[in-house]
UniProtKB/Swiss-Prot annotation:
Biased composition regions of type Basic and acidic residues, renumbered to the chain: 1-29, 1969-1983
Gene name, Swiss-Prot/TrEMBL: OVT1
Membrane keyword on record: no
Protein task: May be a myofibrillar protein.
Lineage: Eukaryota, Metazoa, Ecdysozoa, Nematoda, Chromadorea
Keywords, sorted A to Z: Coiled coil
Keyword Coiled coil: yes
Domain of life: Eukaryota
Species of origin: Onchocerca volvulus
Protein name, entry field: Major antigen
Polar residues composition bias: residue spans: 1951-1968
Coiled-coil features, chain-numbered ranges: 74-120, 151-251, 327-384, 417-1879
Region ranges (Disordered): 1-39, 1944-2022
Pfam families assigned to the protein according to its UniProt record, in alphabetical order: OVT1, PUMA_CC, Rootletin
Length: 2022
């Protein structure tokens, strides 16, 4: 309050407060912004690209290809998946931004811990302003700071700056830690983004491929559709042509027919056909009808003309008929042909239509198939997923399935599953085939034995040959190893030298890099600082605007809340008012107008609320728009910052990677080629020992599994390669962007240099303008905030005032009406009282006259009346006391009225202020909107530029991606072709393996059956042994040749497999390196390209192998032909064997002997097997030798590492040399710079002196002219502005004084209200006492005794009481005085009510005037605001002009003094010149510093340009290498095509060979069948031999018997010599026997010959068999030994493989080390080249500089000649200048240090200082807010008090009404009491005054009329006995109810007491007593004596009852009666 009284605050204080509030708002806005940025949703730029691509794809598919909806849905799903991934990226970005914001908050908290000064005093405001101006503005304002205070303030600021520097150092440490954390988070974020981008790019690529395939399909379908459409169009055209031709023919036919018909009609004389047709029926004539009728007529004419026509006519008709018949037949035939053709054409059309329908159905089917294929893809993916889950159940838990699966993933999974299922199927097929082969082998074992034997012999021979060949190769390998060792030694020596040079080069390169990095960091730091400053400015502006908007919104929300509260209050008030009006409407219809007014006001309020709501909605919408713009701006800034940082990091990484990769690739290619050659040779030497088929089988099985793994890995590698290529493309794009940014930065640097040079000149002007602008902005902000505050306050006051006025107007109307009614009632009551008084006096006189005898009773009665009168006089005295209080209240009321008038005036003024402020707010809003629109336009332009650039970059990126995709597709196709070739080769290998397995199984089965067949084939082998030996030699030679050919193929395959293993290992490492480093990608790509070259070599080797295999096949064909001839021979031999089987019977014994011989041969074969085992034992040391060779290779690798170390030492030496060279260069550059600086100093000194003099003279003249003009205009404007300002100040002072008066008035109102409450209490007590006194006066009469006194004594006493002026006279009671006092009170009340109504009317008028004045005030306020703005501008211009005037005056003074001193003393002039020279030198020093900075920047730019040139060279090399690789790829494609052709030829040849082999197998089967037949024949022959042996035994027996018979015969001859007959018979018989014996002997001879022949043949066969068995045993032994050797070799092979794996691992590690070393070497070489180039450039620069120095020397000489002349003049000055220069140097140093410190503080700690100031401003804002809250609280208190006052006023009004009611009730009650008392007295006096009851009734009526003026609550008498002379108030107690005062006032309503419950009209006890008295009077008097008070009184105006006067006087009494009735 005191501050408000003091008047307006000073300008400085206002500006300081405004800056503080603004800064607090900045901080609040910043906090809000920090809070708001938590919900940032970063939309990655890839969302728009993916969506755009998806949309374009959808449009193409819909328009061109009519793509199905299912595919579009799938595409949309993919795009949604991509957008979801991008949203995940955006969420990650938002999370990181939140973390950054948390770090910022931590910074704020840490900085909040700094010391903040409490700004409690007024001096702090000035200090704050100085701080802000010192920090923010480069100069100090001349108004506020004097020259004396300036150094003190500088010292204070320096101290504060030192304190802040100490605090900032602590904060820097924390900032560094936080920055490290931020960098770590950024790196993690970058890794995550790269992974996501890689995944996204793979998906995009797969998606594009799928789209391409689908587009290709759709194009094919489209081409088919076009073709079908063309065919349909052609068919249609053909049909149309045919139809037209037929139609023409048909028309011709019809015409012909019609002509014939016409001829017939004419001849017959009948009517025409057409007339018949038209006459017969009204049918239309058509061609069909003509034909039909013509045919009918033909028939009819033929039928009708027959009997009539004559013979001549018959002949003619016959001729005509014949002709007509021919024509008719032709016509019918043509018609039928035309019909057929039409039918055919229709059929064709139908066919074409059917074709179209079929094509459409095919299209639908294709679409359905597409949908089914997509569903099938999904099902396949589910099946594959289920398969993978089933496959992985044992190993791991199933991974969660994806919601949406792209086709590439389905294809991959299906491939994987198909490969796995194919592998499983292959395994099962192998098993089945093995089973089938076993079954077939069991049947065909005999056929394969001979071939296996021959092969084994050939292999054994070839193995021996290979052993010798390998021994030779081992010797060669030893020689090569020795050569390699020598080379390694030399390489180690070179390595040592190279290492030393490399170390030296690395050190030098490190130094150069540090220098380059430092320069780059400086440039980047500067650029980042500039960007940060711009961003900070933008953020500050946005924060300011957002803070302003938030404040607006908060104010609007508060206003809305207030409006809601006021609306609720208004609603409650309206409800109360409506209730009151409802009650009033029942009585008075005139109050309807008031209700209508209230309704109108309510509608106006509702409209205003709606308008405010609309305003609030508009403000919220504006705020939302601004918030969205701010969010978008923040997102753009954050995205730009991130992109800048990422681009910088990527640029550094790319530069490094390119430098490394470009060098490493060239070296690695050469080295890898050499190493691959060396490795291939070494591996060939090692792998030539592995020449056996079983090992090949195992290896091939393993290779198949590995190939499947490799395929999977190749698929993964393809994806990885694609991702890497995508990354490379992104890196290229980033490189391009980085180059563009570098160019932009270079341009920016040039521009900045120019701007710096321009800004140095324009700095002073800019500083002054900035000061003016800052002052304007501050003033505008101060005024804006002040206006806002005033507006809010005024709006609140206005609302409260409006509400109060409305309430008061309503109440005034009510009170006016009530007063009018009360006046009418009072007038009527006064008339009635007067009449009653007259009647009463008349009746008293009559009673006095009638009762002279009753003198004593009258005395007693008079004594009673005397006492009563005394009592009433005391009460009147008390009423007179309250008159003073009432007068005081009236005076207070007058004061209040005056205050109300003042408040109304203040309200009017406030309304004016609010209107003016609203106008100002509208202007400010417009300005802000214009600024916001400008900012929006700028942001839109920036965004459009950014989008355009981004679209261009995206297009370039897309083009590059497409080119890369094309290259990738080509490479994939090539890889697929290579894989197919590999698969074919693998299939071939698998087929050969299967055949080998088959043959092996057959050999095993045959080995089992050989033992069984040995005995049977002995004879066969004897014959075939010679041929077998011959064949063995041939087969051995062929087998050796084959083994020789197979060994290199085997070695090459192993080398390929090892190469594949190496590839796998290298690719695995590449994958691991790719995750962390992108640099190794290109190296791995080149490595893969080298491996592709190796693959090409392998393919060439395979071609050579194919050639060898072809030669082998030719040899095998020749061998097969020879074998066929041999088989033919064997067949002939077998035929001869069939003939010789008979001889086998006799050859058993010889066979047994031969078996023994064969056993011996078996022993020999066992011995041969042992020899072979010894040979294998000899091979084992060769394997040991191979192991030793591996160890030697390991040693060689170690030697290579040592050589690498030597090379590093050489590199160190070279680096040292480079360091020395760089030191020399630096020294030379220092000398050169010194020379340049000296030359430039001299030049600048000369030019500066000239320019300075000219410039200063021009500036002085221009400044003088400007100052004069400005001074004139400023004075004119100042005068006008001062006048307007003074008027404004007077108005402001008036407003402030009014506000102070209003506040004082409120205080006085509060005090008066308290006083009024106290007075009300006093009045209440007084009324209570009055009632008690009246009750006492009434009750005294009961206890008076003295009826016997005379009337004379009574009169005397009466006279004495009236005359005595003593204290006794106070005890008198005069009713007339009381009536007069009451009437005065009533008149006073009426006057007050009238005044109140007048005041209300005045308030209404004032309100109307205030509403009208608002418009005027608004207009005036706008005028005032314009005037104030003009005044502010004028003041600012005045200040600037004053500054200029001051500076100009100073300059003029200095010039005047200089002129005077020049005139007076030359020395004075020299001193001034010296000062100018010192200033010039200082500026020259600054210019030198700037020039040095420019030079450094130029150097940095030159270095950057050199680096860019190097990068361009690297890129050109890379492109050349790329073209070279593309050419190589083309060559590879041609070679792969040749390989494919060769493979196809080879397959055809293989198929032909397989057919030949099958033929041979069939032939062998035939031979085997023949052998089986031979075996059967042999068995049969054996059986025949056995039978022959049995016959021979029988014959021998018969011979023995015959010999016995002969002996018996001889005995019988001796005995029976006498019997001649018997002898003759015996002789005959003997002759017969002899003949038979001869025959038998001849047969035996034949048999012997045959047997001998067979024996010989059998012997031969047995010999062959024994040889074969021996060979077989030998072969079996060999096989066993070979199996043992194979098993041993397998074990050895496993060991060797383990060693090889270890060696490969070691080799890989060594290769990685070698690669690293090679990379380092390549880097060093490139760096060395760069250093050499730089050194050459430096030498060139040095030469150019030397030339320049020479030129400068010449110029220097000329300048020296010029300066020599000036030196003579300057020698005298130099002595004085040296001291001044020293001082100036020190001052310059100090100033530079201060400037640097200030700049550092501003750059590094500006934000923190701003935060500190913001904190201080927050404190000020808190203080201001506290003041505001206090003010608001005070206003609320005032409002509450006003409300309470209004409520009290209402209560007082209610109390007045209640008092009236109470007066009426008291009158009524007093009347009843008086009636009761008088009735009692009358009953007592009936004895004496039986004839005079009217006097007592008259007296009772007078008392009743007197009592009707008073209304009081119920009273109870404490005791029945008391002293009448003592007024004991304690015994008469007023009992209040338990309700609060808010619910009733002064006893309104029913009240509960301790003794009785009474109504407002009177107590029930009195009613009871009154009724008792009435009943007594009626009983004693006979009826109506006591009821005369209710009788009518005759008067002049008519008759009127007292009960009506008591009951119908007031509205409140009617309400009370209604309550009683209810």
């Amino acid at each position: 309050m005191e501050k408000a009284r003091e008047g307006a605050p000073s300008k400085e204080r206002r500006s300081a407060e405004e800056t503080i509030s603004r800064e607090t708002r900045h901080e609040i806005a910043g906090n809000d912004g920090d809070i708001g940025t938590d919900n940032i949703e970063y939309i990655d730029s890839m969302d728009s690209t993916g969506l755009g691509y998806g949309r374009t794809g959808e449009g193409i598919s819909r328009i061109l290809y009519e793509h199905p909806r299912d595919e579009l849905i799938n595409y949309k799903r993919r795009i949604d998946a991509n957008t979801e991934q991008q949203r995940e990226h955006a969420d990650i970005m938002a999370a990181l931004q939140r973390k950054i914001e948390e770090y910022r908050r931590r910074f704020a908290e840490i900085e909040g811990r700094l010391v903040v000064h409490d700004l409690n005093e007024s001096g702090d405001l000035v200090n704050m302003k100085l701080k802000e101006e010192w920090l923010l503005s480069p100069k100090i304002k001349m108004e506020e700071i004097s020259d004396v205070d300036f150094p003190n303030q500088l010292e204070d600021e320096r101290r504060r700056a030192e304190d802040l520097a100490i605090q900032l150092q602590q904060e820097r440490l924390q900032n560094d830690q936080l920055q490290s954390e931020i960098q770590r988070l950024r790196q993690q974020f970058g890794i995550c983004i790269r992974d996501k981008e890689r995944i996204y790019q793979t998906r995009e690529r797969n998606f594009t491929r799928f789209l391409g395939e689908e587009q290709r399909k759709m194009m094919e379908l489209w081409s088919e559709l076009q073709r079908v459409r063309k065919q349909c169009a052609e068919y249609r055209e053909q049909t149309e042509r045919d139809l037209e031709n037929q139609r023409n023919e048909f028309i011709k036919v019809i015409r012909h027919v019609s002509g014939i018909v016409r001829g017939l009609n004419i001849e017959n004389g009948t009517h025409t056909l057409l007339s018949d047709l038209s006459s017969e029926s009204g049918v239309e004539i058509t061609q069909d009808t003509v034909l039909i009728e013509a045919v009918k007529r033909f028939h009819e004419s033929q039928q009708q003309t027959a009997p009539v026509i004559g013979p001549e006519l018959i002949t003619e008709l016959r001729l005509a008929r014949a002709e007509d018949a021919g024509l008719h037949d032709e016509l019918m035939r043509k018609y039928e042909e035309s019909a057929k053709r039409i039918i055919e054409l229709e059929a064709r059309d139908d066919e074409s239509h059917n074709k179209l329908v079929a094509l459409e159905s095919d299209l639908k089917r294709t679409r359905d198939r597409l949908a089914e294929s997509q569903n099938a893809l999904r099902k396949l993916y589910d099946m594959t997923y289920s398969y993978e889950i089933n496959a992985e159940k044992e190993t791991r838990s199933p991974s969660p399935t994806k919601g949406y699966v792209p086709p590439p993933e389905v294809v991959r999974s299906v491939r994987y599953v198909l490969n796995s299922r194919a592998n499983d199927n292959n395994v099962l097929q192998r098993k089945l085939k093995n089973a089938e082969v076993q079954i077939s082998e069991l049947t065909t074992k005999n056929d394969s034995l001979e071939e296996i034997r021959r092969r084994l012999e050939k292999r054994i021979a070839e193995a021996n040959r290979t052993i010798t060949h390998r021994q030779r190769e081992l010797d060669d390998a030893k020689h090569t190893v020795k050569d390699l060792e020598d080379r390694l030694k030399s390489l180690e020596q070179e390595k040592a030298s190279i290492d030393s040079a490399r170390h030296h080069l690395e050190d030098e390169i490190r130094k150069m890099r540090e220098q380059f990095n430092s320069t780059l960091l400086d440039v980047e730091r500067r650029a980042a600082e500039d960007a940060d400053e711009r961003i900070r400015k933008i953020d500050e502006e946005t924060k300011i605007r957002i803070s302003e908007l938030t404040n607006r919104i908060e104010m609007l929300l508060e206003e809305n809340k207030r409006l809601k509260d006021e609306n609720d209050g208004m609603k409650n008030r309206i409800q109360d008012i409506e209730k009151e009006y409802n009650t009033i409407i029942r009585k008075l219809e005139e109050k309807d107008n008031a209700l209508k007014n209230l309704e109108n006001t309510r509608q106006r309020l509702v409209n205003e609320l709606e308008e405010q709501r609309t305003r609030f909605d508009t403000m919220t919408s504006e705020f939302d728009n601004l918030r969205t713009n701010y969010d978008s701006a923040n997102k753009n800034t954050v995205a730009i910052e991130l992109t800048v940082k990422q681009i910088k990091e990527q640029r550094d990484e790319i530069i490094k990677q390119k430098d490394k990769l470009a060098k490493e690739l060239a070296d690695l290619e050469n080295k890898l080629n050499n190493e691959t050659k060396m490795r291939g040779d070494a591996e060939k030497l090692n792998q030539r020992h592995l020449d056996e088929i079983d090992n090949f089988k195992k290896q091939i099985n393993e290779y198949i599994t590995e190939v499947t793994i490799i395929r999977r890995q190749n698929d993964d590698f393809d994806t990885q390669m694609k991702t890497n290529q995508a990354k490379l493309s992104s890196m290229k794009n980033s490189l391009i962007a980085a180059k563009k940014e570098i160019e932009k930065l270079s341009e920016m640097n040039n521009r900045l240099q120019q701007d710096k040079n321009d800004l140095i000149g324009a700095k002073q002007k800019g500083d002054t303008e900035l000061n003016l602008l800052t002052e304007k902005i501050r003033k505008v902000e101060i005024e804006f905030e002040r206006i806002k505050k005033d507006n809010q306050e005024l709006e609140d006051h206005e609302r409260t005032a409006r509400d109060d006025l409305k309430q008061e107007t309503n109440r005034n109307h009510l009170l006016a009406k009530e007063l009018e009614e009360a006046r009418a009632d009072i007038v009527a009551l006064n008339d009635r009282l007067a009449k009653m008084d007259a009647n009463f006096k008349i009746k008293l006189d009559e009673t006095i006259k009638k009762s002279p005898a009753d003198h004593e009773t009258i005395k007693s009665r008079e004594s009673k009346s005397e006492k009563i009168i005394v009592k009433h006089e005391t009460k009147i005295y008390e009423i007179n006391k309250y008159r003073a209080e009432l007068e005081k209240l009236e005076s207070d009321k007058d004061d209040l009225e005056k205050r109300i008038i003042g408040l109304q005036d203040e309200l009017n003024e406030k309304d004016r202020d609010t209107d003016r402020l609203n106008a100002e707010i509208d202007d400010l809003k417009r300005k802000l909107q214009t600024e916001i629109e400008k900012v929006r336009k700028e942001t839109t332009t920036v965004q459009e530029r950014y989008h355009i650039e981004w679209d261009e970059e995206r297009d370039n990126h897309q083009k590059k991606i497409d080119s890369m995709n094309a290259l990738i597709d080509e490479l994939r196709s090539k890889l697929n072709d290579a894989e197919r070739a590999m698969a074919d080769l693998q299939n071939r290998d698998s087929i050969l393996e299967r055949e080998n397995n088959d043959w092996k199984e057959k050999s095993d089965a045959l080995n089992m059956e050989l033992d069984r067949l040995r005995d049977e084939l002995l004879s066969v082998r004897r014959d075939a042994e010679k041929e077998i030996n011959r064949y063995n030699t041939d087969l051995q030679t062929a087998a050796r040749n084959e083994i020789k050919l197979l060994t290199p193929t085997n070695n090459e395959m192993k080398s390929q497999l090892n190469a594949a293993e190496d590839k796998i290992n290298s690719l695995n490492k590449v994958i691991t390196d790719q995750q962390n480093k992108i640099r190794d990608l290109t190296g791995e790509v080149h490595h893969l390209e080298g491996e592709l070259k190796d693959a090409k070599g392998n393919v060439a080797n395979l071609e050579s192998e194919l050639d060898t295999t072809r030669e082998r096949i030719h040899l095998l064909g020749e061998q097969n032909a020879s074998l066929q001839t041999e088989l033919n021979k064997i067949k002939g031999d077998i035929d001869s064997l069939f003939g010789e089987n008979d001889m086998l019977k006799t050859a058993k014994e010889s066979n047994e002997a031969e078996i023994d011989r064969l056993k011996q041969k078996l022993q020999r074969s066992i011995e041969n097997a042992k020899k072979y085992s010894d040979a294998l034992d000899k091979l084992r040391p060769e394997y040991d030798r191979l192991q030793n060779l591996y160890r030697e290779k390991i040693k060689q690798a170690e030697n290579l590492t040592q050589a690498v170390q030597d090379l590093e030492s050489r590199l160190n030496q070279s680096r040292r040399e480079l360091r020395d060279a760089t030191d020399k260069l630096i020294a030379s550059e220092g000398d050169r710079n010194a020379l340049r600086s000296e030359v430039e100093k001299l030049q600048h000194e000369v030019q500066f002196m000239r320019e300075q003099l000219l410039r200063k003279t021009d500036e002085y003249q221009a400044a003088l002219s400007d100052l004069v003009n400005a001074h004139r205009t400023a004075e004119d404007g100042r005068v006008n502005a001062v006048q307007a300002l003074e008027a404004r100040k007077y108005e402001i002072n008036d407003l402030q004084s009014r506000l102070d008066n209003a506040e004082q008035y409120l205080v006085t109102l509060q005090q008066n209200y308290v006083a009024v409450e106290n007075e009300r209490d006093m009045l209440y007590d007084a009324l209570r006492r009055l009632h008690s006194m009246i009750d006492r006066t009434v009750t005294i009469n009961r206890f008076l005794i003295g009826v016997d006194e005379s009337m004379d004594e009574k009169k005397e006493t009466v006279l004495q009481t009236q005359k005595s002026p003593d204290g006794k006279s106070k005890e008198r009671f005069d009713i007339s005085d009381l009536d007069t006092n009451i009437q005065k009170l009533i008149g006073r009340i009426e006057k007050l009510e009238l005044e109140r109504n007048e005041y209300r009317d005045a308030l209404d008028r004032i309100k109307k005037k205030s509403i009208e004045s608002h418009i005027k005030i608004n207009k005036q306020e706008t005028i005032f605001t314009n005037i104030e703005d003009q005044l502010v501008d004028v003041e600012e211009e005045k200040r600037t002009l004053e500054m200029r005037l001051a500076s100009a005056k100073q300059l003029l003074r200095s010039q005047e003094e200089a002129l005077k001193q020049r005139d007076e003393e030359r020395s004075h002039m020299k001193l001034k010149i010296a000062k100018f020279e010192m200033e010039a030198r200082g500026k020259e020093a600054q210019l030198r510093q700037l020039n040095e900075l420019v030079r450094n920047l130029r150097k940095d730019l030159e270095t950057a340009q050199g680096d860019l040139g190097v990068l361009h060279d690297h890129e050109e090399r890379w492109y050349a290498h790329k073209f070279h690789l593309e050419s190589k790829l083309k060559d590879q494609e041609s070679e792969s095509q040749q390989i494919r052709l060769l493979v196809a030829n080879f397959e055809t040849e293989r198929n032909s060979l397989n057919e030949k082999v099958r033929d041979l197998a069939s032939r062998l089967q035939q031979t085997e069948s023949k052998n089986a037949d031979m075996k059967e024949d042999n068995d049969r022959l054996k059986k025949d031999l056995i039978k022959a042996s049995t016959n021979e035994a029988e014959l021998r027996r018969t011979i023995d018997q015959n010999s016995r018979v002969v002996s018996d015969n001889q005995i019988l001859k001796d005995q029976l010599e006498s019997a001649q007959n018997d002898l003759s018979n015996a002789n005959n018989r003997k002759q017969q026997l002899e003949n038979e014996l001869l025959v038998v002997r001849s047969e035996l001879r034949d048999l012997k010959q045959r047997f001998s022949d067979n024996a010989n043949r059998i012997i031969d066969l047995q010999r062959h068999l024994t040889d074969a068995e021996n060979d077989k045993k030998r072969l079996t032994n060999r096989l066993n030994s070979l199996e043992k050797t194979v098993s041993q070799q397998r074990t050895i092979e496993t060991e060797i493989r383990q060693q090889l794996s270890l060696a490969l691992n070691e080799r890989n590690t060594l290769q990685n080390d070698l690669r690293d070393l090679q990379r380092r070497l390549a880097r060093m070489e490139t760096e060395k080249k760069i250093m050499n180039d730089k050194y050459d450039e430096l030498e060139k620069i040095r030469a150019s500089l030397i030339k320049r120095i020479e030129l400068l020397d010449e110029e220097k000489r000329t300048m020296e000649n010029i300066l020599h002349e000036t030196a003579l003049q300057r020698e005298a000055i130099e002595s004085s200048l040296n001291a001044l220069e020293r001082e100036n140097k020190e001052l310059h140093r100090n100033c530079a240090q201060l400037q640097q410190q200030i700049a550092q503080l501003e750059l590094e700690n500006g934000n923190r200082l701003i935060q500190l100031t913001n904190k201080q401003r927050e404190e000020y804002d808190k203080f201001a807010q506290n003041m505001r809250t206090e003010k608001i609280q005070i206003e609320r208190i005032i409002e509450n008090r006003e409300r309470s006052l209004k409520s009290r006023i209402n209560q007082l009004e209610n109390q007045l009404n209640i008092m009236r009611d109470q007066l009426n009730s008291e009158r009524r009650r007093r009347r009843e009491i008086s009636d009761k008392i008088l009735s009692g007295e009358v009953n007592k006096l009936n004895v004496t005054l039986s004839g005079i009851p009217d006097a007592y009734e008259m007296y009772d009526r007078t008392l009743y009329t007197y009592n009707t003026y008073f209304g009081s609550p119920s009273f109870t008498v404490g005791s029945s006995s008391f002293d009448p002379n003592i007024t004991d108030d304690s015994k008469i107690i007023l009992k209040h109810s338990d309700r609060l005062e808010s619910s009733y006032a002064y006893g309104g309503g029913n009240r509960t007491s301790d003794t009785a419950v009474t109504a407002p009209t009177g107590s029930s006890s009195y009613h009871g007593q009154r009724s008792d008295t009435h009943t007594v009077n009626e009983s004693e008097r006979g009826g109506n004596d006591s009821g005369k008070g209710t009788k009518q009184v005759d008067g002049e105006g008519g008759s009127l009852s007292l009960s009506e006067i008591g009951q119908g006087a007031t509205f409140e009494q009617q309400q009370q009666r209604r309550r009683k009735r209810q």
